[in-house]
Amino acid sequence: SDSLSFSFINFDKDERNVIAQGDARLVGNNILQLTRTDSNGSPVKSTVGRILYVAQVRLWEKSTNRVANFQSQFSFFLESPLSNPADGIAFFIAPPDTAIPSGSAGGLLGLFSPKTAQNESANQVLAVEFDTFYAQNSNTWDPNYPHIGIDVNSIKSAKTVRWERREGVTLNVLVTYNPSTRTIDVVATYPDGQRYDLSVVVDVTTVLPEWVRVGFSAASGEQFQTHNLESWSFTSTLLYTAQKENN
């Protein structure tokens, strides 16, 4: 179909419209927990989990030169007893058969394999990451402060903005893609009005196949936190775009 729309006001325990990968669990209390916790509900080391929406999304259509205009709206919160919790959560778009890469816990956020994490030609993933890990000897590809980043086929973000991680506070996020300007826009807000904006120009037809799946990924390494998804709505519609110039 030319358009797709779905909405989770919250997540039921028996939710059948999501595919869970790795340590992701529907824990009841209307929350989808992406990384593992112990029997007390406390976060643990070395965990990675993802969820995907069950239906595939038509991102673009070569035969008609149409590209999807999409928007993804979601909210999440993070909790940890540590002062430098890790690693983060990401909304991502990938080929329909996408699976958790081996060795992708920790700073690779469940999205990239260690060998090819910065090799753009080896990857097919578009992601918006909320990265909480920072240390002086931090991941070499990251700024040394918590940040929001837009990732295009690489764990090294195309663009980042400094972000304040707030313990247990819900962040509301809107990610939109406009095919006529080829721009991904991210707006993230806390309940008190603190706002973060980020945008990148990217032609999705050069990054991803025509059919994709959309979802979320999160991971922890040596440092840890819970990654709790509270709500998610998504809508996409194929639109006619101007013919690409043949350079």
Swiss-Prot record:
Claim: Manganese is one of the keywords in the record: yes
pH dependence (UniProt free text): Optimum pH is 7-8 for hemagglutinating activity. Activity drops rapidly at lower or higher pH.
Post-translational modification: Glycosylated.
Glycosylation-annotated residues: N119
Residues binding a carbohydrate, per UniProt: D87, G107, S138, N139, G221, E222, Q223
Residues reported to bind Mn(2+): E129, D131, D142, H147
Temperature notes for this entry: Thermostable. Retains hemagglutinating activity after incubation at 50 degrees Celsius for 1 hour. At higher temperatures activity drops drastically and is lost at 80 degrees Celsius.
UniProt keyword annotations, A-Z: Calcium, Glycoprotein, Lectin, Manganese, Mannose-binding, Metal-binding
Residues the entry annotates as binding Ca(2+): D131, F133, N139, D142
InterPro entries: ConA-like_dom_sf, L-lectin, Lectin_LegA_CS, Lectin_legB_Mn/Ca_BS, Legume_lectin_dom, Leguminous_Lectin
Alphabetical list of PROSITE patterns matching this protein: LECTIN_LEGUME_ALPHA (PS00308), LECTIN_LEGUME_BETA (PS00307)
GO molecular function: D-mannose binding; metal ion binding
PANTHER family, per the entry: CONCANAVALIN A-LIKE LECTIN FAMILY PROTEIN (PTHR32401), LEGUME LECTIN DOMAIN-CONTAINING PROTEIN (PTHR32401:SF47)
Quaternary structure note: Homodimer; non-covalently linked.
Similarity comment: family membership: Belongs to the leguminous lectin family.
Biological role: Mannose-specific lectin. Also binds alpha-methyl-D-mannoside, D-glucose, N-acetyl-D-glucosamine and sucrose but not D-galactose, D-arabinose, D-fructose, D-xylose, lactose or glycoproteins fetiun, PSM and ovalbumin. Shows agglutinating activity towards rabbit erythrocytes.
Name of the molecule in the record: Mannose-specific lectin CML-2
The organism of origin for this protein: Centrolobium microchaete
